[in-house]
Amino acid sequence: MFNSAEIIETITMIEHEHLDIRATTIGINLMDCISEDIDKLNENIYNKIVDKAGTLVKTAETVSKKYGIPIVTKRVSVTPIGSIIGSAIKNLEQEDAINCCVEVGKTLDKAAKDINIDFIGGYSALVQKGMTKGELALIESIPLMMKETSTVCSSINVASTKAGINLDAVKKMGEIIKETATTTKDALGCAKLVVFANAPEDNPFMAGAFHGVGEGDAVLNVGVSGPGVVRATVARLDNKDIGTVCNEIKKTAYKITRMGELIGREVATDLNIPFGIVDLSLAPTPAPGDSIANILEEIGLERCGTHGTTAALALLNDAVKKGGAMAASYVGGLSGSFIPVSEDAGMIRAVNDGALSIDKLEAMTCVCSVGLDMIAIPGKTPASTISAIIADEMAIGMVNKKTTAVRVIPVPGKDVGDFVEYGGLLGTAPIMPVNEYSSEEFINRGGRIPAPIQSMLN
């Protein structure tokens, strides 16, 4: 039996501390959609998505109402399009191949809108060791695809611990991000584009979600959200030692994750598809108090970004994993604390106060999930500098055998001190300064940075 205190605690978490299910994401395998005819490919993709995920929104809302727990977004991820587009464009010139990729993106967008989901991920390519013609066409189509769609998210994996860093792909992505910024209002397309090292195959969070080739035909993955709950827990621990803080965070993470497991399994059962994983990531929102930065400040930092921030984030990340792992049958995805600047009111304040820089954020990514996220930079930033920022973050992931990523937004016409307003979960992004010294010669060398010695595990 539950006692009254536990019931009141749960109500408080939901009503006042922003506890919710951030994402219910159906992963769909599109390998059986492959065709040499682009029209047939698009038809197959559309039909498969509608068949597998057509009732996701209705089912999620029914379960949400049953338990009184908000499910914020309903999403779909698909097999990386770069892996299935090749047959349809193998005999086409590059420009025609690019246009075909855009048509597939528009098919994904139409399917997403017709089944009323929020986002669809998987306009992706895995190019950590090299690029096929289809993958190159897909990458080069991203700016136009973002212009023509509103729900499609794109992710490109350019590095891994086993393969090293594909510097040619890193250079290309700097150019693509720069171009995407000019094709969409306030560079919004860049907010739906992420560059990965060691990308997971079962990630429920956008913009990096795709359905890995090792996955089954369909699966439901869940991402929880509870920074406000963790912050409230830490706020009650005045003058307690750090071990006590860690232990209380673990207990809270356990409760949050159990909720995610419960909701995820029920939605999956009602949809008649297998349940996959719970992603243990703490995902902030722009709402007051629902902030990773605020948790770190409750732990004892005057402002997120000051000395000690990396240590505080490391203990938070570890405690969340330990508590969450006990509560879930299967853990996957990114599973760590997210630090997206524009989506976290505490991070925005830290940037405005001069406490938080891109360099400090890079250090923080060494101990958490997932990377340099939702960072707006001056529109004049050269593509080579964006590529170099990506290369640095990929190196952290490659060497430390972890997932890292970059979602950076060069906003045309904006400079340091300006803001760009996206609204909703994407929030408000202050324009952050980048190092003005050039990395162009390094990026132009091209080739592949070899895998580190720690990749040799056998």
Curated annotation (Swiss-Prot):
Record InterPro entries: UPF0210
Pfam families linked to this entry: DUF711
Family per similarity comment: Belongs to the UPF0210 family.
Matches recorded under PANTHER family: UPF0210 PROTEIN MJ1665, UPF0210 PROTEIN SPR0218
Name of the protein: UPF0210 protein Maeo_1412
Organism this protein belongs to: Methanococcus aeolicus (strain ATCC BAA-1280 / DSM 17508 / OCM 812 / Nankai-3)
Taxonomic lineage from the root: Archaea, Methanobacteriati, Methanobacteriota, Methanomada group, Methanococci
